[in-house]
């Protein structure tokens, strides 16, 4: 399973660590990530609020699940963007 984690803080670090322990996780990406997260995931230089670029990345890299860790993208509607493209995403919708 390919996983994309959106964010760059302590919450996303904990998520990356947890996902890395799963035998089902073949590849983990984090956007934008940080040096600590890079121990567990490949960091991608896409900002957490760049919804279209993140969704494009998920499609192009055949991401099986995207986990949204940061609050601002959730409030901004990132889950709605991913779902509108048929992408699997974990997080609440904007409305």
Can you say where each PLM-predicted feature lies in the sequence?
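ATP-binding N-terminal substructure of ATP-dependent carboxylate-amine bond-forming enzymes
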Residues: 1-95
């Amino acid at each position: 399973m390919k996983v994309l984690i959106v964010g760059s803080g302590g919450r996303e670090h904990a998520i990356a660590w947890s996902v890395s322990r799963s035998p089902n996780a073949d590849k983990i990406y984090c956007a934008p990530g940080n040096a600590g997260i890079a121990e567990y995931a490949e960091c991608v230089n896409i900002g957490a609020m760049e919804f279209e670029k993140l969704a494009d990345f998920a499609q192009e890299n055949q991401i099986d699940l995207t986990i949204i860790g940061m609050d601002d993208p959730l409030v901004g509607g990132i889950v709605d963007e991913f779902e509108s493209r048929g992408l699997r995403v974990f997080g609440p919708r904007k409305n």
